From Swiss-Prot:
This is Ribosome maturation factor RimP. The keyword DNA-binding does not apply. Required for maturation of 30S ribosomal subunits. Keywords: Cytoplasm, Ribosome biogenesis. The lineage of its organism: Bacteria, Bacillati, Bacillota, Clostridia, Eubacteriales. Disulfide bonds: none annotated. Its main location: cytoplasm. The keyword Cytoplasm applies. NCBIfam families: PRK00092.3-1. It comes from Clostridium botulinum (strain Eklund 17B / Type B).
Amino acid sequence: MRKDMLLEKVEVLVKPIVEELSYELYYLEYVKENGEYYLRIYIDKEEDSISLNDCEKVSRRVSEILDVEDPIEDSYYLEVSSPGLNRGLYKEEHFKKFIGREVLVRFNGSLEGMKKIQGILKEADNEFITVQGEKKLKIPTEKIKGANLEGEI
């Protein structure tokens, strides 16, 4: 099964559980590192930071449904974590939530002679984000290789 299809299937199973426990499903990833597969579930909540107890609670509940539904053929490790201080920004809603914050954006190829820009996120929609660094740059979302918050929350 293709990775994107696998993650969609896992999200359908996991998201209702995460939300039922009053968390936000921030991001899912399925990766192979050093010969081992990992399903990583990043959770967040509005009013407070994520604790180890929060991760354990979600891990137990998600583990139960994944064991029953068994959407992943390979053996894997399940990890539940917070997105962290320098969290990745993957979706339009992530970019919109952090307008006004400092970000680092890396490009696919180069854009106006640059491979990346660090600055304040000024605008975001599904087609472009605007970052004010050394200069103001309007970045097409398809040119974004990766983006994350910088600095302190």
